[in-house]
Amino acid sequence: KAIMHCRGVASWIDIEKTKSDKCYHRIITGTIDAELFSIDGKTGELCQDFGENGRIDLRSGLGDHNPAFYYSVSPPAIIGDLVIVGGGIADNVSTSVPGGVVRAYDIRTGELIWYWDPIPPGQEPIIDDLGNQLYQRGTTNVWSIISTDPELNLVYLPTGNTAADNYGGHRNGSDYYSSSVVALNASTGEVVWHFQTVHHDIWDYDVPSQPTFYDIKKDG
């Protein structure tokens, strides 16, 4: 049984369906035990065509860890037909905690479309003995609310800290994206730009708020 909690939901209308179709209106939500659900907004039933009978295990690819060290704490973000999720990490407990990977799934099928592993540019991903790529452990995480801009096709991530919060002697550049706003291409997950608010953050400042947008006039 999933453990639900009051962290918000995302709502999406499938324009390829009619109002009488199942899952015309989808409610997407994460749980504190790290599952992502797609729910029919009319009936409350799981959308069986999403993931594994309506759910996705967000612990997939994170490696062995204490279940209390990774969980969903914010509503998913939606842009186009993608649902994008980060996750909260117990990043002040140990350096050996799950990574802060951000993943984009097809909102209809639950297929993983892309992922962003917040490792420094040039660092090689981890490959296990079976040739499977694993997400880097202890990296910067995105626990707060993600913003999207359909016009620019960008996803804006407010990042937290690299584990462990208050000591950085071991990091060796792994905090490259910590305490930053990171803009990703919504179609590919590639970094477009990022701005780091605190370099080598050992104070657990994070970027705790959802990025917001406004237009300004330059030079009058």
Can you name each region flagged by the protein language model?
Residues 95-96, 125:
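Short Asp/Glu-rich motifs
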Residues 3-35, 68-94, 101, 137-170, ...:
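Repeat-blade elements of multi-bladed beta-propeller folds
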Residues 1, 36-67, 101-136, 168-207, ...:
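Extracytoplasmic/lumenal domain signature
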